C-alpha cells in the first residue's frame, strides 16, 4: 500500500514539474539569469517603456498570447505620472503600480486572476506580477496609522509608510514559509 502511494506521489510530482516547465524547479522566484532589484527609488519617473501593473480586485491587466504573458507599458496610459508608484526593476525595465479607482485598460488587454501566474511564461514576468500584487496589497492596506488613525505618508528614503503624528513606521511584510517534501526512500509522497 505504501509503495503504491509513493509511486502515485512521485508521478504527480513529475507531472507538475513537466506541466510548469520547471525542469524539477517549481518555485516562482526561480527567474535566473534574470534579476529583480527591489530597492526603493523615490524620485523615479516612468519611461514610456516602463511596465505598468494595474489591478482590479485580484485581477491584473495583461495579455497572454503565443509568446506568453505581457504587461502594458507606460506609453499606453496618457494621464499624469502622479498616479504611478515605483515598485522595482527587472533586468533594466522598471515596473510601476498604476493607482486608479476606476481601472480601464487599453484595447486588447484584459484582467486575469493572479492565480494563473504560477504557471505562466515567461517566468520572470509572472514573478514580477505576483511581486507587484504583494506590494499593491501593502499600499492598499497601509493608508492609515494603526496607532492613531492619521493618514500615512510615504517615506522619501525607503519603502516605508510613516505616521507624521506619532512616528509609527510600517514596512512591507515578509511572510517566510517552509517548504516540505515527504519522501519514502527515493519516492516523493507529498510534494
Language-model regions, residue ranges each:
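Non-catalytic linker/capping segments at the edges of enzyme domains
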Residues: 146-147, 154, 178
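Short, positively charged and aromatic/hydrophobic N-terminal segments
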Residues: 3, 7-11, 16-18, 37
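Short, flexible, mixed-charge glycine/proline-rich loop motifs
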Residues: 132-140, 152-157
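N-terminal strand-loop-strand
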Residues: 157-191
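Short basic alpha-helical hairpin corresponding to helix-turn-helix/winged-helix-like nucleic-acid-binding
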Residues: 124-133
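Short functional micro-motifs and their immediate structural scaffolds
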Residues: 150-153, 171
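Short cysteine-rich clusters marking metal-coordination/redox-active sites
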Residues: 145-148, 163
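N-terminal alpha-helical interaction blocks
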Residues: 13, 21-122
Amino acid at each position: 500500500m505504501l509503495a503504491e502511494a509513493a509511486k502515485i506521489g512521485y508521478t504527480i510530482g513529475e507531472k507538475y514539474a513537466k506541466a510548469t516547465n520547471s525542469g524539477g524547479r517549481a518555485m516562482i522566484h526561480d527567474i535566473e539569469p534574470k534579476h529583480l532589484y527591489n530597492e526603493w527609488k523615490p524620485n523615479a519617473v516612468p519611461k514610456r517603456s516602463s511596465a505598468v501593473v494595474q489591478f482590479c480586485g485580484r485581477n491584473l491587466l495583461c495579455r497572454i498570447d503565443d509568446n506568453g504573458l505581457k504587461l502594458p507599458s507606460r506609453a499606453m496610459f496618457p494621464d499624469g505620472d502622479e498616479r504611478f508608484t515605483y515598485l522595482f526593476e527587472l533586468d533594466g525595465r522598471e515596473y510601476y503600480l498604476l493607482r486608479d479607482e476606476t481601472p480601464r485598460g487599453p484595447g486588447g488587454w484584459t484582467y486575469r486572476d493572479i492565480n494563473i501566474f504560477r504557471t505562466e511564461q515567461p517566468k520572470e514576468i509572472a514573478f514580477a506580477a505576483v511581486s507587484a500584487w504583494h506590494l499593491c496589497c501593502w499600499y492598499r492596506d497601509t493608508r492609515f496609522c494603526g496607532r492613531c488613525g492619521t493618514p500615512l505618508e510615504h517615506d522619501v528614503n525607503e519603502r516605508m509608510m510613516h505616521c507624521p503624528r506619532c512616528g509609527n513606521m510600517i514596512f512591507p511584510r515578509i511572510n517566510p514559509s517552509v517548504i516540505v517534501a515527504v519522501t519514502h526512500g527515493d519516492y516523493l509522497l507529498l510534494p
